[in-house]
Amino acid sequence: LFDGFNELGAWGMKIPKEYGGLGFSATNYNRAIGLVVTWCGSCVAWLSAHQSIGVPQPLKLFGTPEQKQKYLARLAKGAISAFALTEPGVGSDPAKMETRATPTADGKGWLLNGEKLWCTNGLKAEVIVVMAQTPPKVVNGKEKKQISAFILEMDTPGVEIAHRCQFMGLRGIGNVLIKFSNVFIPKENLVWGEGLGLKLALITLNTGRLTIPGGCAPAGRRML
């Protein structure tokens, strides 16, 4: 199935044509999602988590030209991506996340430590966008918590798929718990800027929220 989607260019529906994608508008993308969902809901979850909230979406909006050039063409060709925000014990309040990214002493990057739960596509993802606490900043005399977003290669040492999460309906999705232990992230993989990760995540999720009803309505119609 994944190879078939790749032949159709489905992994790059939302990726601009200049990077090898199909460059679909939101309307046409949701039409395609509505078609696929009448056949397989789990397949829609793979496609949607990859490009509605996975690495392509935040890179399109906030990535540097270098980040876009490095990753978007690869993602359009079938390298699967995912979005890592939620944590055990945090749930729907991502501002309370405990995963941390600490600057390295040599200034070349960050060391990531923590856990992320409900990471859809994490089972097969090559690249993810992950949010983590970075050192706080003092604003108007008060310490302000910082959350930043990073691009992470899943084959980096220290990344562990702890277990696959099970679901009652979408039994074919690859949703997992990921653990990070001193995972090195190069400094150039910071997306948008320090302290902007939570805002990036919430903006990115708006696209996913649009895609869900785009799939649910056709699925309901098909069942009727």
Regions found by a protein language model. Give the residues of each.
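A short core secondary-structure module
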Residues: 109, 113-160
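Internal helix-loop-helix
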Residues: 7-78, 120-127, 212, 219-222
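Short beta-alpha junctions and helix-cap segments that line functional grooves
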Residues: 71, 86, 96-97, 115-117, ...
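A structural signal for short hydrophobic beta-strand segments in well-ordered beta-sheet cores
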Residues: 99-103
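Short glycine/proline-enriched turns and hinge-like loops at secondary-structure junctions
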Residues: 24-26, 93-95, 121-126, 140-145, ...
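Extended, charge-enriched "interface" segments that sit outside catalytic cores
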Residues: 1
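A short, Trp-centered hydrophobic/proline-enriched beta-strand micro-motif
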Residues: 77-85
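Glycine-rich beta->alpha junctions and the first turn(s) of the following alpha-helix
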Residues: 160-224
